C-alpha cells in the first residue's frame, strides 16, 4: 500500500523517529476516514483539493488549532511529495 511504503521511506531512508512516523500515519488515516465518510472510499491518487479543504474545515469544527491542522497538512504534503517522486500521482491536491 502507498501509505505503508511512505511510512517505511520515512522510517528507513529519512531516519525519522518512530513517534514522528506514527504521527504521519495517523494524519493520513484521519484523511482516509474522512474521505470514506464523505465519498465512500479513499484512494490517495484520486484525492481532490476540495476534499482536502472540507477535511480542514471539519478539523477546525472539531476544535483543532490552526497549528495542529498545519502540522497535519505538512504530513500530507510530505506524503504527496513522495507520491509525486515515485510517479504515483501527477497532481498534488495540496498544491495551491
Which residues does each predicted region cover?
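N-terminal core-binding DNA-recognition domain of tyrosine recombinases/integrases
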Residues: 4-19, 25-96
Amino acid at each position: 500500500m502507498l501509505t505503508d511504503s511512505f511510512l517505511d521511506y520515512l522510517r528507513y531512508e529519512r531516519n525519522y523517529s518512530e513517534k514522528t512516523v506514527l504521527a504521519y500515519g495517523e494524519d493520513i488515516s484521519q484523511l482516509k476516514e474522512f474521505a470514506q465518510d464523505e465519498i465512500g472510499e479513499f484512494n490517495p491518487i484520486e484525492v481532490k483539493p476540495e476534499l482536502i479543504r472540507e477535511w480542514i474545515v471539519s478539523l477546525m469544527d472539531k476544535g483543532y488549532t490552526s497549528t495542529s491542522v498545519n502540522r497535519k497538512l505538512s504530513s500530507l504534503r510530505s506524503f504527496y511529495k513522495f507520491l509525486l517522486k515515485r510517479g504515483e500521482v501527477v497532481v498534488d491536491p495540496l498544491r495551491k
